[in-house]
Design a protein with these regions (language model features):
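Glycine- and acidic-residue-enriched helix-capping/strand-helix junction motifs
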Residues: 13-28
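Single conserved hydrophobic/aromatic residue that forms the stacking wall/gate
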Residues: 112-114, 118-124
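Short acidic active-site motifs
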Residues: 53-57
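Short, acidic/small-residue loops that bind anionic groups at enzyme active sites
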Residues: 87-104
Length: 124
């Protein structure tokens, strides 16, 4: 099984940015844990602060990955283009968030939900 972990804007700063909300664990630490727990799963990662690059990565996932784990960062709340890209591909996509977006501002709640298969909230 091959999974693409796709991270959006500012997630390159995970572990250093707004630690009270997002925690102090760097993405590399999460990845090390995931690889230890799921040694038989091929995990590839891609992070971009650019919306179009995330859309391109979603499009390229078809036929290459069995699924995508996607944290769109702030684009979760604003990007219809990313929502449409997820809806346009056959690859299953699971939306994840480090913080509990449902406990935060209303505008953070819904835009990606309609097209993802599942949602995982608050990893901190």
């Amino acid at each position: 099984m091959k999974i693409l972990i796709l991270n959006g804007p500012n997630l390159n700063l995970q572990g250093r940015r707004d630690v009270a909300v997002y925690g102090s664990t760097a993405f590399e630490e999460y990845l090390t844990r995931l690889r230890a727990v799921f040694p038989d799963v091929g995990l590839d990662c891609f992070q971009s602060n650019v919306e179009g690059e995330l859309i391109d990565a979603l499009h390229r996932s078809e036929g290459r990955y069995d699924g995508v784990v996607f944290n769109a960062g702030g684009y979760t709340h604003t990007s219809v283009a990313l929502r449409d890209a997820v809806a346009a591909i056959a690859t299953p996509v699971v939306e994840v968030h480090i913080s509990s977006i449902l406990a935060r501002e209303e505008f953070r709640h819904e835009i990606g939900r309609a097209s993802c298969r599942e949602r995982v909230l608050r990893l901190v």
